[in-house]
A protein has these predicted regions:
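Acidic, low-complexity mobile loops and tails
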Residues: 36-38, 151
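Short, contiguous, helix-prone interaction/anchoring segments in small proteins
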Residues: 40, 44-45, 49-56
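Local sequence-structure signature of Cys/Sec-based thiol-disulfide redox active-site neighborhoods
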Residues: 31-35
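Flanking helices and flexible, charged tails adjoining ferredoxin-like Fe-S electron-transfer domains
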Residues: 1-27, 54, 59-75, 80-255
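Histidine- and aromatic-rich ligand-binding microenvironments
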Residues: 27-28, 38-41
Length: 255
């Protein structure tokens, strides 16, 4: 095997290891399908943005198969050619779905060197026994003009953390359970008479003074729409370059 080497290994039907092996160390991004709540946070915080035909950058190194344009029946897939194993997705993941191992040790270098902040979190256990954490403060509002209660019930079931319920012809949310993710707002696009307005105002109490990389990544999470922001050049990616430097790597490998 020539080094460095990148590959994906399916351990079983639910567990996938995304491996980056070099002479001095091995990084493994572990993904557990059973824990994924399809929140969309990993796709937003990934610092790697890929230019597609010189259009605004919307694709990162991790996301749903549709977002990644990769054929798969998994909820989330990783582009091993673009992933830099920085751990940003692990750092934000509310469902503990992703885990980064460096030489067998669970660690995120960007947190250890102070580039990404540690923050308070609210953790609870779902009915299926899996844990989920809330990492951002904000608000959520539904605009429901749907008359068919069966359609409303179907929409409330889109929530993977049991935070939504139907009250008559309206949608109620338990804000203590809601993790203010992107799942229901994305799902609402498939419902003609339901829309969602989410504001992610700030992270839980932040510890320390993180670097400018923090500011760049926060642009991808906070705000009304949580749009991915990047530059529009096929050859440059300033945020990813900054992350690579903080990880002690010179540049992103090109295909």
């Amino acid at each position: 095997m020539s080094l460095p080497a990148k590959k994906a290994i399916e351990i079983d039907e639910n567990i996938t290891h995304y491996i980056y092996k070099m002479l001095s160390h091995e990084s493994i991004l572990k993904y557990d399908e059973t824990k994924c709540v399809e929140c969309g946070f990993c796709h937003r915080v990934c610092p790697v943005t890929i230019s597609i035909y010189d259009e605004p950058l919307k694709r990162t190194a991790i996301g749903t198969p549709k977002e990644m344009r990769i054929e798969s029946d998994k909820k989330i897939v990783v582009d091993t050619e673009k992933c830099i194993w920085c751990g940003s997705c692990t750092w934000i993941c509310p469902g503990y779905t992703l885990e980064l191992l460096i030489n067998g040790e669970n660690k995120i270098l960007l947190v250890e060197n102070g580039s990404l902040a540690e923050f308070d979190e609210e953790v609870r256990t779902l009915e299926n026994g899996h844990k989920v954490r809330k990492v951002v403060h904000g608000s959520i509002k539904f605009n429901c003009n749907e008359k068919d209660t069966k359609v409303i019930d179907k929409f409330t079931e889109e929530c993977a953390v049991d935070a939504m319920s139907r009250e008559g012809n309206d949608i109620a949310v338990d804000i203590d359970k809601c993790i203010l993710c992107f799942k229901c707002s994305e799902a609402s696009k498939n419902y003609d008479n339901i829309s969602v307005d989410i504001h992610r105002d700030q992270f839980m109490k932040v510890k320390g003074n993180p670097s400018s990389v923090w500011n760049g990544i926060m642009l991808r999470v906070l705000g009304k729409e949580g749009k991915i922001k990047g530059i529009m050049s096929r050859s440059q990616n300033k945020l990813a370059d900054s992350v690579m430097r903080l990880l002690g790597k010179e540049s992103i490998e090109e295909e």
